């Protein structure tokens, strides 16, 4: 019996919404993107619940099980290091000092979570799409 295919989720925590996408092992989108309220001002636990809701909607729409998600890419609108938020930025005060990466990974059954800030995520995404045409990329955001 062959192993079921694995998928990866991308979750973008914004000031008002969480935007999410599911991709296959080749990086091709599977199903539709999902957007839910982020609830960042209500605290990180409220947002973790919204992230899980987005994952459930993504997997349900694609007809896959959550245990088929091999990894999650998570971006946050704040500076962080090693998964720990170190400045409030667009988040509520309870985010500062929180290891978002590890806590969210624990909530979703130990699935690896790879986290960066939203600016780095935007640059990495643009580079991934355009690297066939350009050798370098400079991203300037307002």
Identify the residue ranges that each predicted region occupies:
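Glycine-rich phosphate-binding loop and adjoining helix at the ATP-binding site
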Residues: 44-52, 67-72, 78-136
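Short glycine-rich, Thr/Ser-proximal phosphate-binding strand/loop in the N-terminal lobe
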Residues: 2-49, 53, 85-87
């Amino acid at each position: 019996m062959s192993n079921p295919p694995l998928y990866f989720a991308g979750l973008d925590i914004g000031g008002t919404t969480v935007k999410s996408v599911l991709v296959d092992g080749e990086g091709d989108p599977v199903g539709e993107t999902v957007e839910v309220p982020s609830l960042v001002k209500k605290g990180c636990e409220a947002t973790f619940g919204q992230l899980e809701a987005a994952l459930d909607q993504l997997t349900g729409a694609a007809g896959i099980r959550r245990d088929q998600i091999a990894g999650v890419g998570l971006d946050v609108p704040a500076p962080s290091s090693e998964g720990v938020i170190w400045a409030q930025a667009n988040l509520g005060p309870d985010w500062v000092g929180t290891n978002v990466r590890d806590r969210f990974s624990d909530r979703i059954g130990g699935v690896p979570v790879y986290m960066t800030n939203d600016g780095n995520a935007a640059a990495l995404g643009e580079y991934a799409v355009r690297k066939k045409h350009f050798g370098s990329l400079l991203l300037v955001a307002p």
